[in-house]
Amino acid sequence: MRPEQEAAVNKTFNYFKNKKRLKKDDSLKFLWNAKMRFGKTFASYQLAKRMNWKRVLVLTFLPAVQSAWEEDLKLHIDFKDWQFISKDGMQYKEINKKKPFVCFGSFQDFLGKNKSGKIKNKNEWAHEINWDCIILDEYHYGSWTERAKEIYDTGEKDEYNEFLKVGISDNFDQSIIPITTDHYLYLSGTPFRALESGEFIEEQIYN
């Protein structure tokens, strides 16, 4: 790892290991101000290894970033035993449950409902797992309209329509994610809104 990646991993590891939860079911959270070329996917996976996480869920508004997450996991020798689950790739039922895995998906897909207003059948398994960590990639990216435009510009019409149906607002927070986890890792190259709002305290931020 580069020095800045190692610094981010070390600070996050120490916070997660030493911070006590106020309640048993509380989730700890940490924010990385991951500027361009920081190498957030590689550093995130190194943190997962150091924390000994086995089940990691990566959620993003922009499915187009999947390739970066998938390639870093599959092509680097450090993660040779890890498996990668995605919408159009390997599925949960196909993996070796004894080995660690990463599931990549979009907010709009995992928060979307079927016609009956219930969790989509294909995503039910993800709601039955207590994840070691949920990584929120570019979570604080822009306003609702900026997010919608960015998704539309990728040409992925299904994701765009799903985003509009879910109706994710600018005040969207982790409490409405119907999936449980012990840790949240927020990744953002533009975390200004989160920093200004006081959502994170200094010990929860790598800047």
What name fits each language-model region?
Residues 24-25, 96-99, 116-132, 176:
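Short basic/glycine-enriched coil/helix segment immediately N-terminal to the Walker B
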